[in-house]
Amino acid sequence: MKADKQLVSTSKFLSLVLRHQPGVIGMTLDEQGWLEIDGLIANANTRGKKLTLELIHEVVATNDKKRFVLSDDGLRIRASQGHSVAGVDLNLTEANPPATLYHGTVDAFLPRIREQGLQKRSRNHVHLSADEATATNVGSRRGKPKLLLIAAQRMHQDGHIFYLSENEVWLVDSVPPTYLTFPT
């Protein structure tokens, strides 16, 4: 197994390229977010980022959040969700959410969320978790986490469309404040 540091660095690089800025290596995602692996490797290496097929496969196999997926033929790779690149359609199908979903955040964002709800901002969707632990972990990346509860089933009944990504992240366009329960 590659050193953890190399896997983390490669995962971050793949997130940058496959979710946000494929242009940093002179590439463009197709309409479903795929990149040809051979082109990814060649373009990354010519720009000073050491990348191999073996390393890509190891990152895909070991990433605990299952951020990346390979095409059935193994020739392409894409991010499972989290894109900020406009025009990426992951061909997600509508899903019926559980009664409650969760979102982790920090105190600094609570006033805006109370007023505006959860907004996708630069991403294509708002990301929600099916369990408290995952949402708390997400929130802890920016400080002391605060857990928000989302009345997902009520939202769905009111016409909001939910999707479930390949790596089990719940996605929705926005969460209005009326569907949120805030920490006390």
Swiss-Prot record:
Q: Does the keyword Transferase apply?
A: yes
- Which InterPro entries does the annotation name? Ptrans_KptA/Tpt1, RNA_2'-PTrans_C, RNA_2'-PTrans_KptA, RNA_2'-PTrans_N
**PANTHER family per the record?**
PUTATIVE PHOSPHOTRANSFERASE, TRNA 2'-PHOSPHOTRANSFERASE 1
What species is this protein from?
Rhodopirellula baltica (strain DSM 10527 / NCIMB 13988 / SH1)
Q: Which residues cross the membrane?
A: none
For this protein, the Enzyme Commission number is: 2.7.1.-
| Functional summary from the UniProt entry | Removes the 2'-phosphate from RNA via an intermediate in which the phosphate is ADP-ribosylated by NAD followed by a presumed transesterification to release the RNA and generate ADP-ribose 1''-2''-cyclic phosphate (APPR>P). May function as an ADP-ribosylase.
Protein name according to UniProt:
Probable RNA 2'-phosphotransferase
Lineage, top-rank taxon, reads Bacteria
The record ties this protein, via Gene3D superfamilies, to: 3.20.170.30, RNA 2'-phosphotransferase, Tpt1/KptA family, N-terminal domain
